[in-house]
Amino acid sequence: MEEGKQFRLTFSSVSGKKVEADFDGGVVTSDSGVLLAREMDRKIGVIDCLASALWDRRHPSYVSHSLEDLLRQRVFQLVCGYEDGNDSDALRSDPALKIGCDRLPLTGEDLASQPTISRLENSPSRPDLYRMALAFGELFVASYKKPPKEIILDLDDTDDVVHGSQQLRLFNAFVDEYCFMPLHIYEGHSGKLITTILRPGKRPTGEEIAAILKRVIRFLREAWPKTRMIVRGDSHFSTPEVHDLCEDSPRVNYVLGQAGNKTLKQLGKPLMNQVLKDAEDTDQSVRRFTKLDYQAGTWRQSRRIAFKAEVTQGKANPRFVVTSIRNRSAKFIYKFYCARGRMEGFIKEHKNYLKSDRTSCSRFEANQFRVFLHSAAYVILHALREHALARTELAKASFETIQLRILKVAARVRERATRVDLHLPTSYPFKDLLRTIVMNLDTA
């Protein structure tokens, strides 16, 4: 009996006829949209750039799959929503994925198996990972046709809960779980990824944040000497080390949340009292802003604070933002700070849609490598949305929507003497959209 016939599925009948399914449909893929990711990567060179950062320690005589092939296979699986390395066994013969990895769908050699992918993930050394981090910086810089006048360095961390005995997993009392706490840095205007650094499961100290930021700023400054940079983050990034680093770096400013304390609340008390009175008189929410000058005991100098005095539903809601920008109003600074809410969306796409919290390797370096693989998938999907989906109904779509509508498309694959044909479903509802995307890719 043929393998596909062994798994016959039975459903409710329709019009008196049995409804059955099997896996004997022939050479059909569920992910023909991976070819879009392939075309995008050929234009921006994510895989080649990352592969050049790795040192292949394998004996050349025993290598069946190059580093480029392995990276391409693993990253394209992530792009299509297959976050588990074990999926490689089921997908190594997938015709669309083989085309994506520059192999013929039927006569080409199958892709790597799960054990080979596992060896790949455990092979990078710390110098390899450092070079990969630099490669992401190079990809970020190359994504601009000319140096931008201004970029925003949005930084935030997120909990990555683990359930094993991974190296450097720590118990985090706030999360109430053992976890990692990876640091994400994106460009705030565009959502482009700059870097993702896996960290132990605790809040970073000011020295740790400043050490990472210093490398990022130095790298970008070498590429763009005249570009203005603004570091933006919430209150646990507001440390003397970060303030001093930004103030000592040319054309670098910061806008950071500042935790309230007795001194700050006392400085803002006159405005807060006025807002409380106005809210009581009008029985409405009231919000006002002002600038304050404040110097904490650990700060080397006084700094500007944008203070928001707000009363909502009868309750006071004071908020403070510290900044090195002195020629803007407090209201502007606060609104600029609040715009960092987009950062949560960037992390959501990286962590939830691309499943970058699958850090289940024992070695810390292997888990950092996994995070970088997910970051590569993020860069490809972001570029696809920015260039190929521009001016379409998916121009602002989430990665999840992009996967469902244009990547998860079934196709029958035929390999001929001089070409490869993919026959997509006649009932596919987004034909015109797909044509537009392919045309945009041609001109990207």
Predicted regions and their residues:
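Basic, amphipathic alpha-helical segments enriched in Lys/Arg and hydrophobic/aromatic residues
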Residues: 356-427
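An anionic, glycine-rich sequence signature occurring as long contiguous blocks
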Residues: 2-23, 253-352, 438-444
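Short, surface-exposed basic-aromatic patches at helix termini and helix-loop junctions that form
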Residues: 243-252
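Acidic/histidine-rich, metal-coordinating catalytic segments
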Residues: 156, 227-238
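Short amphipathic alpha-helical "interface-anchor" segments enriched in bulky aromatics
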Residues: 40, 88, 330-369, 373, ...
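Short, glycine/acidic-rich hinge or "gate" loops at secondary-structure transitions
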Residues: 90, 104-106, 228-230, 389-398
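Dynamic "connector" segments at or just before major functional cores
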Residues: 1-204, 208-223, 248, 385, ...
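Short acidic (Asp/Glu) and glycine-rich catalytic loops that position anionic groups and cofactors
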Residues: 13-19, 50-54, 95-99, 313-317, ...
